[in-house]
Amino acid sequence: MALLQISEPGQSPDPHQRRVAIGIDLGTTHSLVAAVRNGVAECLPDAQGRVLLPSVVRYLGGGGRQIGYEAAAAQMQDPANTVSSVKRFMGRGLGDITGREKLPYDFIAAADSGGMLSLSTAAGVKSPVEVSAEILATLRYRAEDSFDSDLYGAVITVPAYFDDAQRQATKDAAHLAGLNLLRLINEPTAAAIAYGLDNGAEGVYAVYDLGGGTFDISVLRLAQGVFEVIATGGDSALGGDDYDAALAEWVMQQTGVRASTPEDKTSVRLAARACKEALTATDNVAFTADVAGATVQFDVKREDFAAVTAELTQRSLAAVRRTLRDAQIERDEVKGVVLVGGSTRMPVVRAAVAEFFGREPLTNLNPDEVVAIGAAIQANQLAGNDAAGDLLLLDVIPLSLGIETMGGLVERIIGRNETIPTAKAQDFTTYKDGQTALAIHVVQGERDLVQDCRSLARFELRGIPPMAAGAARIRVTFTVDADGLLSVAAREQASGVEARIDVKPSYGLSDEQIARMLQEGFATAQQDMQTRALVEARVDADRLLIATQSALDVDGDVLAAAERTAIDDLMHALRATLETSTDAAAVEAAAQALAKGTEAFAAQRMNRGIRQALAGKNVSAL
């Protein structure tokens, strides 16, 4: 008789079977895939022994495509169909891309994309999600060939600043590439894991991540295997590409040469990148580029490069200062600084970071590989291969989330820099008598007025039982999952009617917009407080006028003529103040006058209600 084999829930029937899980760093300039093999995390090479995959895809006529090194080599002769730095376009609309005129691509807003941009290529219209999926699929095939096995799943890293739309676009790309996505984790968290900071490390660490397209700074607190991201910051207009552009522009000014065609611009940009990389190892390099049919040559010294790019380096340190201030951490409290991203190889950057923090940064791991290695370690644990090494990762929300309330005010539900995953709820009520539906507008930002924040989603809760204004209790719950994606639910407590929405905006906030919104929030805090006070006073006054008029319509006959006239005059005065005054105190004073002037009326209404309730009843019945 055969026996049924029953394994522990969630475990493989074969205790010796190991699931293959990978970590992927989907980067702006290069992408990598890593995995844990024989207990050691390592980046997986291609057939030629190269671990870096250029994040470049070239589309050919007839549906063909080239990916990686082959595509990168074609940038000079076919820039319009060779897509690089696609990470900058993920989850974004046409209006979000600055300097479009300097890029060789034909951007369009596809009719079925919900506002997300696409690119017109020789192989048809391609979205950034599709381009990223080509890169992810190439890395997936590399991993499958390396292990000669199917993959259990993947952890993919994203910048800490990525918003809902950008994270969702990354998840969509993973799905399109045939990957089982185990988790999205923030790049600085992955870097900290790679450095082994989970192995008993305690204290505050900073992760300085200067990649090809963006700069991110994160402050983490480590305690007994718990990774808590205290604060994040950055600058989306700052990366290795911007150092290249600054050097290229300076050389063009020095030589008097102008690059006008897409081919010339690409030639100058690639020459600047090669010059920058060479200056990492030597003090003097010849800048060489073909422009307008002629060869341009110019000697560049390391000190020239440092002077030309000094403003960019200082911008990164300004973002570091803001983030430390958000975290309420002094720079001397930082126990260690982790460098991430190929651009941190620049001596000028390393020297500036060391001077700022007063300590040499951690550089013993390859800055190009550190994020992928950390993702691989996390993937290995999520696959159940290293149960003893479980980590608790606490990432944060970059901007506050809330809903619109009466008067166009924002009521924050989840605050900026709160750890995720999280769920928070708050009760709201109706504004008018008999209201049976509630419109819920979800917004993101630090300002007090809806018009100054970013709209994320709208939905309606219908079927609310008719009640007096303020009687209904609607609980609104915000839930942010471990990938940083938001869902919102609204439930009327008495009837149980419920509505919910997964917030998937067609495109979202750029890092630059997040930084700008934070700066505006700080700069206008006093003004916002005054505006909010005025709006709240006006909403309260309107509610008082509605309630008073409703009471007069029902029980106005209990008033003497003089009493009715006095109340009418107070109501008229309050309406006049609402129409003419922008002073919250004046509105509050007029509303208080009406409230005080109707106290006797309220007492008379209560007496009438009591008499009506007692009518026809004797003492024994009571």
From Swiss-Prot:
Keyword presence, 4Fe-4S: no
The keyword ATP-binding appears for this protein: yes
Keywords assigned by UniProt, alphabetized: ATP-binding, Chaperone, Nucleotide-binding
Domain of life: Bacteria
SUPFAM superfamilies on file: Actin-like ATPase domain, Heat shock protein 70kD (HSP70), C-terminal subdomain, Heat shock protein 70kD (HSP70), peptide-binding domain
One Pfam entry name: HSP70
GO terms for biological process, alphabetical: iron-sulfur cluster assembly
Membership in a protein family: Belongs to the heat shock protein 70 family.
Protein name, as recorded: Chaperone protein HscA homolog
Gene expressing this chain: hscA
